[in-house]
Amino acid sequence: MLDTSFIIDLFKNPDRVKKYFSLIDKEGACLTSISYFEIFRAKRFMSKREISYFNQLFSAYPVYTFDLEASEKASEIWIKLERLGETVSVLDVMIGGIMLANGVDKIITRDRNFQTMSKVVDIEAIIV
């Protein structure tokens, strides 16, 4: 899974993330509808080049959505984190739910919220 922060780095700082390309080639990549929302909510500030880049990227990889199964998994993550007294962005918990619902166990990200989530669910956060 490619998190929003990594997706943005692909466009803005490709040199920063190029060392992860072999992992992506080896294991594949997928995206989420949450990341699409996070990126395109700023569409009015984006150049045509950025819009085109991100549209092509989201067309090139599978995009998993926040369906009922993902909602259930996200709720479970949220409850487990609450019990530990941990707070994580609701959008990141939704991405975590999507991961679990689709059998995805790794995410490439700059966001340490996924490391926090890995305390309560079996996901690996690969921090850029």
Protein language model features and the residues they cover:
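Short, well-structured N-terminal submotif of metal-dependent ribonuclease cores
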Residues: M1-L31, R41-Q56
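Histidine- and aromatic-rich ligand-binding microenvironments
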Residues: L2-D3, T32, V88-S89, D111, ...
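Generic structural signal for small/hydrophobic residues in well-ordered secondary structure
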Residues: D3-T4, I39, A74, M99
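Alpha-helix capping/helix-boundary segments
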Residues: F6-I7, S35, A70, M94-I95, ...
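A general structural signal for well-ordered alpha-helical segments in protein cores
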Residues: V17, Y36, I51-F54, S71-A74, ...
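Short, hinge-like loop/turn segments at secondary-structure boundaries
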Residues: S47-E50, L81-E82, E124-I127
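Active-site neighborhoods of divalent-metal-dependent phosphate/nucleic-acid chemistry enzymes
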Residues: V63-K106, R110
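Acidic, PIN/NYN-like endoribonuclease modules and their adjacent C-terminal/linker elements
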Residues: N102-V128
